[in-house]
Design a protein with these regions (language model features):
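N-terminal single-pass transmembrane signal-anchor helix
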Residues: 1-36, 42, 46, 50
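A general marker of short, structured functional hotspots
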Residues: 4, 27-30, 53-54, 125-127, ...
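Periplasmic/extracellular, small/polar-rich flexible segments of pilin-like filament-forming proteins
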Residues: 59-147
């Protein structure tokens, strides 16, 4: 009987390397998408905080706050956004209460794009909020309620 050497052949190693390459090619884009969505959730949470302040202002004053800068958003609405690094600009329109945010430091696919949160008053004095976005905002990264 012949004694065969122990170990893997070159073909077997190449097959394993090819399989690992295919798995990496599938996994990396998925991972990137999940990290973008996680970073965008910070922006969505900040916008929801501002929406709570706008709701309270509207219910107290029966008008919309006019806050064109992040400083005025914080002082006029009494909300603290903390250090939200993903927002380059946030404002609240005094005309219709729309919250507008420009995102940054997330990914080239969404940086510079705009998200909006628009209120609709209902009879009992509360507000219904609807998400919006700029036309070039990638569909896979839009807020869940707006997909």
């Amino acid at each position: 009987m012949k004694n065969f050497g122990q170990g893997f052949t070159l073909i077997e190693l190449l097959v394993v390397i090819a399989i690992i390459g295919i798995l990496a090619a599938v996994a990396l884009p998925l991972y990137k998408g999940y990290t973008v969505m996680a970073k965008l959730s910070e922006v969505e949470n900040a916008m929801s905080t501002v929406a709570s302040g706008v709701t309270a202002f509207y219910q107290d004053e029966n008008s919309w706050p006019d806050c064109p800068t992040v400083i005025e958003v914080g002082s006029s609405l009494g909300v603290s956004l903390g250090a939200v690094l993903r927002i380059s600009q946030i404002s609240v329109s005094g005309v219709d209460g729309m919250i507008t945010v420009s995102v940054q430091n997330i990914d080239s696919m969404v940086d510079g794009k705009t998200l909006t949160l628009s209120p609709t008053p209902i009879a009992d004095g509360s507000l219904i909020w609807d998400w919006g976005w700029s036309a070039d905002f990638p569909p896979q990264f839009r807020p869940k309620s707006g997909r």
